Curated annotation (Swiss-Prot):
GO terms for cellular component: endoplasmic reticulum membrane. Belongs to the OST4 family. This is Dolichyl-diphosphooligosaccharide--protein glycosyltransferase subunit 4A. Residues 30-37 are cytoplasmic. The lineage of its organism: Eukaryota, Viridiplantae, Streptophyta, Embryophyta, Tracheophyta. The chain crosses the membrane at residues 9-29. InterPro entries: Oligosaccaryltransferase, OST4_plant, Ost4p_sf. It is a single-pass type III membrane protein. Its main location: endoplasmic reticulum.
Length: 37
């Protein structure tokens, strides 16, 4: 079972991962060269 330290690390990692994913998605969607398809 997870203790508080493991849970905190996992939540922090998941938050950073989602944040990076959203930023990357935004850059791909905002880049004009991808809109021509």
């Amino acid at each position: 079972m997870f203790d508080d330290q493991d849970l905190g690390f996992f939540a922090n990692f998941l938050g950073i991962f989602i944040f990076v994913l959203v930023i990357a998605y935004h850059f791909v969607m905002a880049d004009p060269k991808y809109e021509g398809n």
